[in-house]
UniProtKB/Swiss-Prot annotation:
Pfam families: Helicase_C, RapA_C, SNF2-rel_dom, Tudor_1_RapA, Tudor_RapA. Transcription regulator that activates transcription by stimulating RNA polymerase (RNAP) recycling in case of stress conditions such as supercoiled DNA or high salt concentrations. Probably acts by releasing the RNAP, when it is trapped or immobilized on tightly supercoiled DNA. Does not activate transcription on linear DNA. Probably not involved in DNA repair. Keywords: Activator, ATP-binding, DNA-binding, Helicase, Hydrolase, Nucleotide-binding, Transcription, Transcription regulation. One of its GO terms (biological process) is regulation of DNA-templated transcription. The lineage of its organism: Bacteria, Pseudomonadati, Pseudomonadota, Gammaproteobacteria, Enterobacterales. This is RNA polymerase-associated protein RapA. Its EC number is 3.6.4.-. It comes from the Bacteria.
Amino acid sequence: MPFTLGQRWISDTESELGLGTVVAIDARMVTLLFPATGENRLYARNDSPVTRVMFNPGDTVTSHEGWQLKVDEVKEENGLLIYIGTRLDTLEENVALREVFLDSKLVFSKPQDRLFAGQIDRMDRFALRYRARKYQSEQYRMPWSGLRGQRTNLIPHQLNIANDVGRRHAPRVLLADEVGLGKTIEAGMIIHQQLLAGAAERVLIVVPETLQHQWLVEMLRRFNLRFSLFDDERYAEAQHESDNPFDTEQLVICSLDFVRRNKQRLEHLCDAEWDLLVVDEAHHLVWSEDAPSREYQAIEQLAERVPGVLLLTATPEQLGMESHFARLRLLDPNRFHDFAQFVEEQQNYRPVADAVALLLAGTHLSDEQLNTLSELIGEQDIEPLLQTANSDRDGAESARQELVSMLMDRHGTSRVLFRNTRNGVKGFPQRELHTIKLPLPTQYQTAIKVSGIMGARKSAEERARDMLYPEQIYQEFEGDSGTWWNFDPRVEWLMGYLTSHRSQKVLVICAKAATALQLEQVLREREGIRAAVFHEGMSIIERDRAAAWFAEEDTGAQVLLCSEIGSEGRNFQFASQLVMFDLPFNPDLLEQRIGRLDRIGQAHDIQIHVPYLEKTAQSVLVRWYHEGLDAFEHTCPTGRAIYDSVYEQLIGYLAAPENTEGFDALIQACRKQHDELKAQLEQGRDRLLEIHSNGGEKAQQLADAIAEQDDDTGLVNFAMNLFDIVGINQDDRGEHMIVLTPSDHMLVPDFPGLPEDGCTITFNRDVALSREDAQFITWEHPLIRNGLDLILSGDTGSCTISLLKNKALPVGTLLLELIYVVEAKAPKQLQLNRFLPPTPVRMLLDKNGNNLAGQVEFESFNRQLSAVNRHTGSKLVNAVQQEVHAILQGGEAQVEKAARELIDAARQEADDKLSAELSRLEALRAVNPNIRDDELAAIEHNRQQVLENLNQASWRLDALRLIVVTHQ
């Protein structure tokens, strides 16, 4: 290898040293100085792992002074290169730059530059890079992108709502599904879609204080979204970091009380430029035309400033018309400005709902009914469709569906309101109540008497709360020595029940964490019962482990002991036995407890066991819930309203349970009120809205399509290949689970999304649903997305050399495999990836410029090739550099045609789809005022921006592989 003083070389093994200069040569050794780092290296002259740096005409090089030169000609003088060309800063021509004056911090980013500089990658990394490009491009174009990655069952009505709303520009909608149908999951799916597509980057979730942790857990566990919880303490900390504390995080959860209490805080929230606002339990925002509440006004201020708003609320019929109007007014104050007009409109929708019912029933329509339909739809050329729908011909069913769709588009609040009911969604279990009446121990009787004397000044509500939990009264008097569990008959009953039902998984819920901890100790020490505990004092990871242990079929815990707050946001559909060790104070909390098991996907009827102590508030409450509200065995949409209306009387009975006079009459009155309210709710059901929200056959097809994707072996193969190459250890744990841990030889020191102590993953949705400690890996999971970014944002695998053993070709035949990427650079919110994601174009060129890629498929070709070590590869490249240059130039000429076709097709698709959506909404605007002007303007602006940016799409060489034929 001929060395000359002043020549520039690069190390094959330490490319981070930059450009080296030959500073000393003797008979056997050569010394290189690397000015960028100030280090020297001594190499053997005969076989040193270094590559001569030689640029070619067309390249741009940088001088040590920082200016750049576009190379036109390369001369050699006494073994040193001189580059002649045009200075890019002054445009001066015929400028000479000697190689000794090249910038030492030179970084080779183009694949061909890296190849010629000897920075040759492993062959498996090249293959991974191409697969990553291919898969990423395919995933971007999936129509249900953003709906596959969540750890949830694929429930059609949820997917339907998320698919409709999640793809809108700045969606402003009301999600009003009945309890247990998954409003939180629907909101999470919409948030996930908007974030993934780039339609939103900053999200604020405002919830009641008691639900903050539930949302935090749901967003993290189900959607891999890390929200920050803002309370007084976190807000104070963030004030040191930024003028506006809310600018310190992109995804924030805070309580409604936190928002309402402080005027400056609300101003900071309003100024924080959120893209999406989510408000849970929005029915608690009290409004009247004369006196809106402070909470309502606070959310109204936010809703005026934030483009996208999701309100989660109880069903409209539960709320009353005025309250329902108040929610809609937050979403679109221009459209919903007059309550009286709104009431009139709602009454006018009855014929529409009747028409839909007729169409769905499949019965023949009378002429009068056909005329009504024609008027309601208001299209000029609707007659043929009506005739087909009213016939027995082929296509009658699809014509009916199209008419239903047209009615839904044109009438009602279906664009802003989504509401599913349990009647309209199948798959819920029955609930059976088992009450166990137990005697009140004398120890409790004494403690209650003393408490009554000492607590005479307490309010009725405080006394009522005390009377619900007699063990706490006893413990207060006895202190640490008070062992209530030794005589409380509920403990004896619980132990007896658990020992006689060893094969059953049992969820036990009690109000306080201390009760759960004491019960766990008693069950373990007395009967050896395996019990996990779950309370608010535990971290999310600790709760995950407890939930996972409870979920294990054979070796897991038989019972999970939960506190009221600790169980929020967790669902255990695999269990069907629920024990309420005590009772919650209001019907909402009771429904929340039962809702841990009563979810879609529950395979068995739920057995609810309530052991209660006679002559206590428990005995009063169990009767009121069951006989007055029917709240144990059925969902109780009327519960809160009745609870509020009889609150004072109920508190009186709870505070003094021995006084039963008039209690039977109260129960009867509550039951009568419950039955009447429930009948009103049923009568007021809006079938049209339910059909729209449910999604019908279309929603089922969406769920089926995503389920089919769940079995994608391509993802598993790619992920394992990715983890291997990144250097992540994989340990098969069985049951479709793998443990990933970082290794000491990873491509990057910290792989984003992989904890220091590792994590358990699964590719199986059912396993992920039953094992909360296992992360559910899909194309949308951060581990995969971060892995794709890691590979594709750098130069990993961008150039390699392989040998092809093929005696049918002459030895030394060259092939060049080129991977070009066609892409359009644009702001993320334009979502150009729907039409033109970074798309790989593969070419396999011989020395004559023939493209063989069509005949030679990548994977089968890759299997025929063998790797070359870097040092040998550098020698090969040096020997064939001129030929490679010629083939590369031919490739540049050929790729333009393929790239142009891709860009033109993307432009056409974008124009067709966006124009069609705009035309549809503009036509509907005439008959449905729920279509907002700003939404139409945004779609038109978006269409223009998309087409403009697609016009500027370009292509570049992303990776290349030099293949040399051998016979050995």
